[in-house]
């Protein structure tokens, strides 16, 4: 082989090895860069990081706060102010339109309103009424609660605010929904022995307590379908002889129809719910007596076990000597 050819071959070989070396360098460069970057990051102190954070919060050279100039911050705040103002305005407008369709005097949908529940007075610490006849301090709170509750039923108050109505029929009042409705008188004297007039202790001092029962108010509701609803009481759990005698006032424990329907608190301002007083004149002493009092009448539901207040109420009497 001629010397010139050997030199060409050698030069060609060198040319071939050149790219291989360059490729090796290219492969090694990224690793070296990562190592150098890690080294640079590792060399930063907490002071350096704090300085960078300070510059981020306020850069005096570029006069920026968190990367934004005052003009940029002003524009973005103005954008969000306008955006949320429009959003709130749309929500308020939708609420306004919806409220225009609702009457403040009469509920729009009443087809699924259940019959009324009932409640008792006095109601202090739950549905257990316990006291000792010989210790006035045990029954005086119940007496005070009864007087406070019946203050709105005083005869003079009822005569001043309400009118006398025809018994035995619904008191239907026409006119606009916004017109103020009249209310029928319910005087506490109708409760007779349980009025607190003749006996200011409502029988508690004698071991013959009076319990008041009232129906919850439902706008437009007419109980009994033309027949007055009445109340009866019996022992709910235990011996029936534990409850030997109960007197009811007024009208043998009936809710007169003239107090219905109820038109709502906005128009029926002076309305006072009718009451039935239950005078427990003979109850077993020194024993817990579980009593159930319920409403009876057309359309009344009083047998739902999951709701102890729907058309009935269960409470406990404990009368000590």
Curated annotation (Swiss-Prot):
Tell me the PROSITE patterns matching this sequence: ATPASE_NA_K_BETA_1, ATPASE_NA_K_BETA_2
Stretches of the chain found on the membrane's Extracellular side: 94-321
One GO biological process from the UniProt record?
Answer: regulation of DNA-templated transcription
Tissues where this protein is expressed: Expressed in skeletal muscle, intestine, heart, brain, retina, inner ear and skin.
Topological domains on the Cytoplasmic side lie at 1-72
Q: Please outline how this chain is modified post-translation.
A: Glycosylated.
Annotated region described as Disordered, given as residue ranges: 1-41
The answer to keyword Protein biosynthesis applying to this record is no
Q: Please indicate if the UniProt record lists Disulfide bond as a keyword.
A: yes
Q: Name one GO cellular component term.
A: sodium:potassium-exchanging ATPase complex
Instruction: Keywords in alphabetical order, please.
Output: Disulfide bond, Glycoprotein, Hydrogen ion transport, Ion transport, Membrane, Signal-anchor, Transmembrane, Transmembrane helix, Transport
Protein localization: Membrane
Provide ranges: composition bias, Basic and acidic residues: 14-41
Q: Membrane-spanning residues where? A: 73-93
Q: What is its main location?
A: membrane
Cysteine-cysteine disulfides: 165-184, 194-210, 233-293
Q: Which residues are modified by glycosylation? A: 132, 176, 193, 239, 252, 270
Specify the protein's topology with respect to the membrane.
Answer: Single-pass type II membrane protein
**Physiological role:** This is the non-catalytic component of the active enzyme, which catalyzes the hydrolysis of ATP coupled with the exchange of Na(+) and K(+) ions across the plasma membrane.
Q: Which family does it belong to?
A: Belongs to the X(+)/potassium ATPases subunit beta family.
* Additional notes on this entry: Its function as a Na,K-ATPase beta-subunit will be lost in placental mammals.
Subunit (UniProt): Composed of two subunits: alpha (catalytic) and beta (accessory).
Q: What is this protein called?
A: Protein ATP1B4
């Amino acid at each position: 082989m001629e010397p010139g050819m050997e030199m060409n071959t050698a030069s060609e070989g060198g040319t071939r090895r050149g790219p291989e070396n360059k490729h090796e360098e290219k492969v090694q460069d990224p690793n070296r860069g990562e190592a150098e970057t890690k080294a640079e990051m590792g060399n930063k102190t907490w002071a350096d990081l704090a300085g960078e954070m300070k510059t981020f919060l306020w850069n005096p050279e570029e006069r920026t706060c968190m990367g934004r100039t005052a003009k940029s911050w002003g524009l973005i705040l103005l954008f969000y102010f306008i955006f949320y103002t429009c959003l709130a305005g749309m929500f308020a407008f939708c609420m306004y339109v919806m409220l225009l369709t609702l009457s403040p005097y009469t509920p729009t949908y009443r087809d699924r309103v259940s019959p009324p529940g009932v409640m008792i007075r006095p109601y202090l610490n739950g549905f257990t009424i316990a006291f000792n006849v010989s210790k006035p301090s045990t029954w005086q709170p119940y007496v005070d609660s009864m007087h406070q509750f019946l203050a709105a039923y005083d005869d003079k108050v009822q005569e001043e605010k309400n009118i006398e109505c025809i018994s035995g029929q619904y008191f239907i009042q026409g006119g606009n929904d916004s017109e103020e409705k009249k209310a029928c008188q319910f005087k506490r004297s109708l409760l007779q022995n349980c009025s607190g007039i003749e006996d200011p202790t409502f029988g508690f001092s004698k071991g013959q307590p009076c319990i008041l029962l009232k129906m919850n108010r439902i706008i437009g509701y007419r109980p009994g379908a033309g027949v007055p609803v009445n109340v009866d009481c019996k022992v709910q759990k235990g011996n029936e002889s534990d409850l030997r005698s109960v007197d009811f006032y007024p009208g043998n424990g009936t809710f007169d129809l003239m107090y219905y329907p109820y038109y709502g608190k906005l128009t029926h301002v002076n309305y006072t719910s009718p009451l039935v007083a239950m005078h427990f004149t003979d109850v077993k002493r020194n024993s817990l007596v579980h009593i159930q009092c319920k409403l009876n009448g057309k359309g009344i539901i009083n047998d739902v076990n999951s709701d102890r207040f729907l058309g009935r109420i269960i409470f406990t009497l404990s009368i000590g000597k």
